Amino acid sequence: MAAPLLHTRLSGDVTAAASATLSASRTGLSDMLALESDFFNSPPKKTVRFGGTVTEVLLKYKKGETNDLELLKNQLSDPDIKDDQIINWLLEFRSSVMYLTKDFEQLINIILRLPWLNRSQRVVEEYLAFLGNLVSAQTVFLRPCLSMIASHFVPPRVIVKEGGIDVSDSDDEDDNLPAIFDTCHRALQIITRYVPSTPWFLMPILVEKFPFVRKSERTLECYVHNLLRISLYFPTLRREILELVIEKLLKLDVSVSRQDIEDAEEKAAQTCGGTDTTEGLFNMDEDEDTDPEKKADQEQPNQMAHPTAERLDVLLCLLLSYIEDVCRVHGKIDNNKTKDLYRDLISIFDKLLLPTHASCHVQFFMFFLCSFKLGFAEAFLEHLWKKLQDPNNPAIIRQAAANYIGSFLARAKFIPLITVKTCLDLLVNWLHMYLTNQDSGTKAFCDVALHGPFYSACQAVFYTVVFRHKQLLSGNLKQGLQYLQSLNFERIVLSQLNPLKICLPQVVNFFAAITNKYQLVFCYTIMERNSRQMLPVIRSTAGGDSVQTCTNPLDTFFPFDPCVLKRSKKFIDPIYQIWEDGSAEELQEFKKSTKKEVVEDEDDDFLKGEVPQSDTVTGLTPSSFDTHFQSPSSSVGSPPVLYIPGQSPLLTRIYD
């Protein structure tokens, strides 16, 4: 039976790692001093030698006599080498460490390949002492030592051969893996005591040793787990480690679409019938004494049918666990630690996530972090707002920022209405300023290549109103309507830039139904005209140009569409605003009774034709329509930057 997966949550391990880190800082020094004391106070044990002591063998090699060295290497390479033999050799090498120069690189490599981790505690302690002595005396071997340690951050491979043919190559399910990993981290800290610059040399090795993303989820989980542990006692590496982990997560994320994941789950459900559902209902016992086979069955409902989604889910769950464990101390959010982690993650977000189109799940690490305190959510929104309104940013970045703003405002249950209103005010005022700048220009026509950020901001506003209109109108309906009327949607919708033509049809349909119901603006006439203009217009039948009046569609995706990863969504669901089907049905009924002049076929399009399978906006994905986006370096007529440090309407508040 396979050993249980390493804590999908870092709980025990981050706790173990944190305690190991703290204990390393408290007891690690005394342990290492004790090892040194043992070394200096106890002479090497008597052992069988071929040609003398290790020191004599090394000195002979310097004189050109290589036979004894070859005998020594052969003995060290013996697969049946015993614990006592290893201890005796290590004691000898520690006493000869000053002679182990670069000339003996091959010998050192053999020593580093010794199977020391699964040996007795005496072997482990002696080997750790040897590593400390070696790197302190011969820093040239620092990289090989670090590389050896990093290679043990994944389960060893077990190869079964029959007739000289490999018939099995899988992870070794060793129950001692946690203890092995603990020893590896202890080794890193011992080496760092002797060579303080170790973290600087370690990071490139961690990048190099990262398993290929198509490796098993267990291999990936173990390696990422150990990387995150390293960030606890090497805080200077945290940002680089998190960037490495998120970069690998992103590669997995963009390689499998939400639709692929859902199709695989549906196919698996059809194959299994009702069996999995029954097991999921009754396997609720969490008793630690449960039989391992039954325990594995209990975990089965969390497994993703798509192999790439399974890897992504395991790793994202690990990252979310890490974020929570770093930020939450004794059950409460530690403001300072969360601030520091936020700074690291927002820089990674800017570098990796914001320029990446159509990632479905990785970005939820920011969503989750921002849920800890309102101040972090507001800081994130203001950060995105600055990206959107800055004309010096590439249009594609500004559009992505708008997508994130709209999706975050719509989906984050922890964002209060006052913050939603503040953001709507900022966005709508910016849209009106943009239109004012276009009134005197020569490019006031519908073209996504020219006005991409404008259309993305429009869509963010429409999307937010669709999700939040009930809250905006709840309580005092009159005041709510007055607020929505003050946004002057009519000017935006009726402008020459014609955002209803560019924005995603699903969003436009819902927005039109809401604004029509409350008589804010009547969109259907414009939508009907836009639908007619989508037809090609033939200018000449005698070799003339064929003119297609439709412009390129907006390259849209909503970053915080529902998470479909089974483990990770347990972190997200409690703080996530789902789309209420009742709202769609209510608007659908209202639309049927009020929209007379639009063609009849559009009635079905409101929830069926243009809205995905779930009949809600939640299904909007990057694959909703073909993309022909052209992104200029900046859009024309952008309003001046509104943000003034210390005077922004959206304050970045980090609450105590």
From Swiss-Prot:
Post-translational modification Phosphothreonine, affected residues: T198
Q: Where is this region: Interaction with EIF3L?
A: 555-650
Instruction: Enumerate the residue ranges of region (Interaction with POLR1F).
Output: 498-650
* InterPro entries named among the record's database cross-references: ARM-type_fold, RNA_pol_I_trans_ini_fac_RRN3
For this UniProt record, give its keywords in alphabetical order, as a comma-separated list: Nucleus, Phosphoprotein, Transcription, Transcription regulation
Gene Ontology CC, one term: nucleolus
Tell me the GO molecular function terms.
Answer: RNA polymerase binding; RNA polymerase I core promoter sequence-specific DNA binding; RNA polymerase I general transcription initiation factor activity
- In residue numbers, the region (Disordered) covers 265-304, 608-641
Determine if Transcription is one of this entry's keywords.
yes
Q: What does the record list as GO biological process?
A: cytoplasm organization; DNA-templated transcription initiation; fibroblast proliferation; homeostasis of number of cells; in utero embryonic development; intrinsic apoptotic signaling pathway by p53 class mediator; negative regulation of intrinsic apoptotic signaling pathway by p53 class mediator; nucleolus organization
- List the disulfide bonds in this chain: none
Q: How is it modified after translation?
A: Phosphorylated at Thr-198 by MAPK9/JNK2, which abrogates initiation complex formation.
Task: Tell me which SUPFAM superfamilies the record gives.
Answer: ARM repeat
* Compartments it resides in: Nucleus, Nucleolus
Question: Which residues are reported to carry the modification Phosphoserine?
Answer: S168, S170, S638
Q: Which PANTHER family match?
A: RNA POLYMERASE I-SPECIFIC TRANSCRIPTION INITIATION FACTOR RRN3-RELATED (PTHR12790:SF0), TRANSCRIPTION INITIATION FACTOR IA RRN3 (PTHR12790)
Its assembly, as annotated, is: Part of Pol I pre-initiation complex (PIC), in which Pol I core assembles with RRN3 and promoter-bound UTBF and SL1/TIF-IB complex. Interacts with POLR1F, EIF3L, TAF1B and TAF1C.
Return the similarity comment: Belongs to the RRN3 family.
Per the entry, what this protein does is: Required for efficient transcription initiation by RNA polymerase I. Required for the formation of the competent pre-initiation complex (PIC).
Can you say what this protein is called? RNA polymerase I-specific transcription initiation factor RRN3
- Tell me the organism: Mus musculus
Gene for this chain: Rrn3
